[in-house]
Amino acid sequence: MSEELKFLGFKKDIVVLDDIIPQEMADSVEEKVIADIFPWYLLRDIEKSKLTEKDNFRVVNDENTVNTLQLGHGIYNMEDVGQEINSNMYAQVHAICDYCCQKFDIKPSYIRQKFNLLGQNSSIKEGKYNTPHIDNRWFNSYSMIYYVNDSDGDTIIFNEMGGKDITKRPDKLTIKKRITPKKNRAILFRGDYFHTSTNPTKSEKRIVLNVNLTDINE
């Protein structure tokens, strides 16, 4: 992917669609990722080192931030390592992503695909959230989140944006939209919005498929 390609501008801002893939496909992916043999890896929502990097303007660490542990499972990543497939779930995940993109009227070029699992965290009180961030260095990209299971733990999208010319982190974040997880719901939003997750406080787990992509038509 070349950053020199002319970007024609975002056609979409924030879009939420329910029942986005066939039910049997939604049931199948949930069944596989909650199986005892599915490989999960312990991570943080954002690496702690990135919070203190003075020239990293893609993360925010404010008074409401809770840097939480999570489990992750990488599927595909071309941002840091070139095109690399990391999982035998690739074919199924790619099919899900293509199906979602068709519904969103996107012709995708994928940057990253991964599963994230958040468990309960007692530090998530009213007004608290996980680390606000922008997913990748391509500010002309979209973020797409597919909710694998029913749970609480909203996704929060902020009004504040990043960009290639940003020289500081936002002084204050204001909430633009909250989206509650629901199985077989997906959201698509501009990749230059700061956004974050919240841990569930009622449900046992919150599982999402997190995807970064560009629209070839833009």
Predicted regions and their residues:
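Non-heme Fe(II)/2-oxoglutarate
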Residues: 2-106
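Catalytic core of non-heme Fe(II) oxygenases with the double-stranded beta-helix
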Residues: 86-218
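Ampiphathic alpha-helical segments that act as solvent-exposed interaction surfaces
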Residues: 1-2, 204
